[in-house]
Regions:
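Short glycine-rich substrate-engagement loop in P-loop NTPases that contacts/grips substrate
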Residues: 43-45, 85-118
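Short regulatory helix/loop adjacent to the ATP-binding pocket of P-loop NTPases
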Residues: 137-138, 154-166
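C-terminal helical "lid" of AAA+/P-loop NTPase domains
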Residues: 205-210, 216-231, 243, 265-269, ...
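C-terminal engagement/docking regions of AAA+ P-loop ATPases
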Residues: 238-290
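Pre-Walker A (pre-P-loop) alpha-helix and adjacent loop at the N terminus of AAA/AAA+ ATPase modules
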Residues: 19-60, 104
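Walker A/P-loop
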Residues: 50-88, 137-138
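Conserved AAA+ ATPase "SRH/arginine-finger" region at the nucleotide-binding site
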Residues: 89, 168-181
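Conserved AAA+ ATPase "sensor/coupling" helix adjacent to the nucleotide-binding pocket
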Residues: 166, 179-195, 224-228
């Protein structure tokens, strides 16, 4: 017999559904104290931490490779200063969507219940063309909205000068091996799924090398290791196992999609870091994907 619907059952169902979220999403930091990396920006006494602690957020652009915490940092800032938060993806939004969200921001700015200016976060802002970027200028200049843009491309080439003159650019760096080690430890001890499993960390060289300073990529690899063993088997992190699993399970690659740019970035970082194994792997991913 089907169990009757109750609010209790519904809440449990929603809670269970969160267990199917990707590991990277389950571990997304909610505060600056949980944020890993970018100490030059969010460490004690550094520019972004001082800005957040003061509550006075000015418009800025976060420039860095994929998986280094650009989106997470923007969300943390909005929570810390208790500001209305709107987000747009430049890949899927046009001038109409920009104008619609700016109208909402204007309404929030004039509300007696809003203490701080609304924050508009635009991911992949370099994908906006000139007219789309122009549509932001008035709201930014008048203080209707605080703009936070995220880009993997050099803003000097991709962002129009009038917008750059109104927004400071902050550079985010790939995560170091120490950062990745801290993230790995957090995943194994804090994640509701992984902390119930037996995990044997024997070697981390391959895990960190294939991650290329990208937190999301490392957590996705860890997720793959978890999914590739039975529930009663231990999860073993060792160089040969990591390499074998990645070769057996090439992730989806869409040369016209966002993953295309993530993989190109990983390939370039592997070459620059003199990691031939990782470079060959990411090159093979691109060739196989067309």
């Amino acid at each position: 017999m089907r169990q009757p619907f109750t609010l209790h059952n519904f809440v449990i169902t929603i809670k269970d559904m969160t267990m199917f979220e990707p590991l990277a999403e389950r571990l997304r930091p909610k505060s600056l104290d949980d944020y890993i990396g970018q100490k030059h920006l969010v460490g004690e006494g550094c520019i972004l931490r001082r800005m957040i602690e003061s509550g006075h957020i000015s418009s800025f652009i976060l420039w860095g490779p994929p998986g280094v915490g650009k989106t997470t940092l923007a969300k943390i800032i909005a929570v810390q200063v208790n500001a209305p938060f709107y987000t747009l993806s430049a890949v899927h939004s046009g001038v109409k969507e920009v104008r619609d969200v700016l109208l909402k921001c204007k309404a929030d700015s004039g509300s007696m219940f809003t203490k701080h200016r609304p924050i508009l976060f635009i991911d992949e802002i370099h994908r906006f063309n000139k007219s789309q970027q122009d549509s932001l200028l008035g709201a930014v200049e008048m203080g209707t909205v605080t703009l936070i843009g995220a880009t993997t491309e050099n803003p000097s080439f991709e962002i129009i000068r009038p917008l750059l003159s109104r927004a400071q650019v902050y550079v985010l760096q790939p995560l170091s091996d120490d950062d990745l080690a801290e993230l790995l430890q957090r995943a194994l001890t804090k994640d509701e799924i992984l902390k119930r499993r037996t995990v044997k960390v024997e070697e981390t060289d391959a895990l960190f090398r294939y991650s290329g300073g990208d937190a999301r990529k490392m957590l996705n690899i860890l997720d793959l290791l978890y999914q590739s063993v039975g529930e009663s088997e231990p999860i073993i992190i060792r160089n040969d196992i990591v390499t074998e699993r990645l070769q057996q399970n090439p992730a989806a690659y869409d040369k016209n999609g966002e993953m295309h740019y993530d993989i190109i970035s990983a390939f370039i970082k592997s070459v620059r870091g003199s990691n031939p194994d990782a470079a060959v792997y990411w090159l093979a991913r691109m060739i196989e994907g067309g």
